[in-house]
Amino acid sequence: MHWTPEHAQPLNQWPEQHLDVSSTTPSPAHKLELPPGGRQRCHYAWAHDDISALTASNLLKRYAEKYSGVLDSPYERPGLGSYGDAAFLNGAKADPEPWPGPEPPYPLASLHEGLPGAKPAGAGGSAGLGGSPVVAGNLTEPLYTGNACGGPSAATEYAAGYGGGYLASGYCAQTSAALAPPPPAALLQPAPPPGYGPSAPLYNYPAAGYAAQPGYGALPPPAAPPAPYLPSGLAAPTPLPAPAPAPPRPAPYGFPGAAEGVSLKRKAVDEGAEARYRKYAYEPAKAPAADGAAYPAADDAECRGNGFRAKPPGTTEDGTGKYGGGGSLKVLGSPAYAPQLEPFDKFAERVPAAHGGFAEPSGEPAKGVDPGTLELVSSKMVDCGPPVQWADVAGQGALKAALEEELLWPLLRPPACPGSARPPRTVLFFGPRGCGKALLGRCLATRLGATLLRLRGAGLATSGAVEGARLLQAAFAAARCRPPAVLLISELDALLPARDDGASLRAPLLTCLDGGCGARADGVLVVGTTSRPAALDEATRRRFALRFYVALPDGAARGQILQRALAQQGCVLSERELAALVQGTQGFSGGELGQLCQQAAAEAGLSGLQRPLSYKEVEAALAKVGPRAPPKELDSLVEWDKMYGSGH
């Protein structure tokens, strides 16, 4: 039988509507005990095709209706209403005919008498089934009526879950009045031990719960089991008091002594690795020094800008107290080009080699150079501007990556490039005017933590051949005396005229490039810039190991440059206005975009006014400022890059 939501219908219709009789192989738990004679004859006739499947189904259905009449007994259900007498006049219950068969009907009890609330429970307590309180509430006092098998008879009142189909084969259905009823449940319980009494207290825990323990103390004791689970007559043990809260744990990150040297050493290695790679990320620009000198003179006490500090000559590193003894941890990192680096206890101090990276300076003064000229170069040519990071250069993403891979990494990490015998010491930037070639040179000096010296080729050319050669030699000598150093020579094509009439600086430049960047020039990087690379002869071109083309800024870079320049004028444009400006400034260089913003501010007369710049004023200035690089010049630069450029 299956339970369906239509249980509110008359009970005498349940077997008729919900009894599945079409199955010929039901499970033992659900098979009905139909009369064996008629059922066997029906199955025999159906198996031999004497009757059709429809006839067999009708016969089995009639047998089921006859048999289900035994289950239709009146059932009083308090609290849910009762059924009227007319509801039981129809169906199989109103059939007074006895069941025909060779065996008498089994005296089965109604299935509804075991439901909760059908009859009041007796006061005899729990009996049988282990004294379960659930079964005891549904059984009456005369529970065990004897039978021939020594167990409860089929007429015994069970709970709702127990049906006739679930009885074991050992249970007999015949009743027997000869057996006496079993003793009450109280007599079946064992006697308690002598040390226990019913007057002992049970679990007496407060109902309000436990107070919160501070910190991470011990867990509260488990809740007491309910009374029905305790055997009657056995006293529960006295509950243990709650343990005292654990003391607060000390701070997890401290600087203990030598006992935790291993963990602190591992932490120091991790910090060194993190600081080692942080230098090559695109970080924001750092604040300049208090005295305004972003690239100070290189001495033994100054930091090189890459996380290393020089060690005084003649001193040794004290290994004790490096990781223990309460001393503070030192900043660790990989070797960089700086004099007298601090040795790491895991690696020996690197000896400068002619094929490695930037080596330590000799400390000897430059020979063959006027001291006055050297002092003039040191005071006038050293760039003291703010440091420039990669984020300050708009666009040029591929060029930045190529410089990191082909120039900065070989210079700062010589062991990481075993294939190259010597890292490059010269680089040439060529491209249209105002594209940020000098800005890239300043950024290289910042990334290397080097002193920046700047020379203008046009200024050296106008000073004459003799004076220009003297200044050029003094600049290279000053760079060798102040390693690590970056010597930036802008407008390199001005030093190399088309005709070698004796007034050019080609020969002194080649001599300085060979000597200043030769085997004795460790720690010097020469950066040249030009907008006319075709003016360089083959000898000068071969002196520069790396040659990179700095193209005009793309749309995203132009938008970034315009936003920065207009923000200085107090102008904030919408996205649509900025997109219109970016589209209208195609072919502009970075310098020309800056001139556009200055022209708009000058026309608006913002020198003494507080009114911000508007889009109309910038649009009016756009009609007067345009790109200066002709397409023919751009095509020639692209062709020269294909022939002689390093590519990126």
Swiss-Prot record:
Record InterPro entries: AAA+_ATPase, ATPase_AAA_core, MT-severing_AAA_ATPase, P-loop_NTPase
Cytoplasm keyword on record: yes
Residues annotated to bind ATP: A394, G434, C435, G436, K437, A438, L439
Record-level Gene Ontology MF annotations: ATP binding; ATP hydrolysis activity; microtubule severing ATPase activity
Reaction(s) the record says it catalyses: ATP + H2O = ADP + phosphate + H(+)
Cofactor(s) it depends on: Mg(2+)
Family: Belongs to the AAA ATPase family.
Protein name: Fidgetin-like protein 2
Protein's organism: Rattus norvegicus (Rat)
Name of the gene: Fignl2
